[in-house]
């Protein structure tokens, strides 16, 4: 929840979810 993964999730899910990122406020974050 604190480290941006450099990916947005406005239209599609986080591809970086594979490495533990999740969508928050239209941006993918890790932890």
UniProtKB/Swiss-Prot annotation:
Pfam families: Cyclotide (PF03784). PROSITE patterns: CYCLOTIDE, CYCLOTIDE_BRACELET. One of its GO terms (biological process) is defense response. Disulfide bonds join 5-21, 9-23, 14-28. It comes from the Eukaryota. This is a cyclic peptide. Keywords: Disulfide bond, Knottin, Plant defense. There is a cross-link at residues 1-31 (Cyclopeptide (Gly-Asn)). SUPFAM superfamilies: Cyclotides. Belongs to the cyclotide family. Bracelet subfamily. Probably participates in a plant defense mechanism. The presence of a 'disulfide through disulfide knot' structurally defines this protein as a knottin. This is Cycloviolacin-O6.
